[in-house]
Amino acid sequence: MTKYEYIWLDGYEPEANLRSKVKVTDGEPPEWSFDGSSTLQAEGGSSDCILIPVEQYENPTNEGSLVMCQVQTGEHETHPSNSRAAADAVVSDEWWFGFEQEYFLTNPDGTILGWEDGTPSRPQGEYYCAVGAANVKGREISEAHLDACLDAGIELTGTNAEVALGQWEYQCLGKGIKAGDDLWVSRYLLHKVAEEFGVSVNIHPKPKTGDWNGSGMHTNFSNEAMRTSGSEEMFTSMCEKLGAVHEEGISLYGSDNDMRLTGLHETQSIDQFSYGVSERSKY
């Protein structure tokens, strides 16, 4: 018998939450159902939704496997909350993605680690990639998460303390549609590891207003042509094409980004598109 920890995204908006439950069975993980009325994915009168396994990982926090799933309706049709199915139809395995996920660690009452007595007395600046108990909070969680992801077979390529106290980042490399699966499972493991330390994870774009950096997920991308014969002309053309759909893109990148994309704190204003070489104000 094998323990399979099924993971999926619920129907909450504007951002979905991660959900999970465990199945013990022989053989490979089968399709499984759940109560969609409890996850905003179905009405109570017809609440069955179907979990379709799409990727498996070693479970570093328990025996068995982690099973990333996409959601279908009870009639085996793509659920409206399932954006993976549409992505799978167009994403190529020769597309590489490098995700840089920033986050804050918080206490059960919502206060950020290191902020228990109010705003830190020193401004941001000394906390980035820092050492020392006065400059870093939560390193043990970041390192445990890194180990968990590597044990699961997820290609994390690094981690570091970020600009604000209690803020961290990790980098996740993936190829094709599996890159998205790896990212979601890495986030799931981050939440589970944080549970063990009695803290929570906050990926809101701007947990603290004022002169403090927010959190984003910078996304690096390349296809085969970019990696083998990329030129300045090619990259400029791609950036111009991205600029032409800037508003559409912003509408898909999650809520409250207007709080982070202000033109300050290593960001560009949300209503402007720009690009440059090694230019962090373009984020």
Task: For each feature predicted by the language model, list its residue ranges.
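Glycine-rich, acidic/polar active-site loops that bind/position phosphate-bearing ligands
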Residues: 1-283
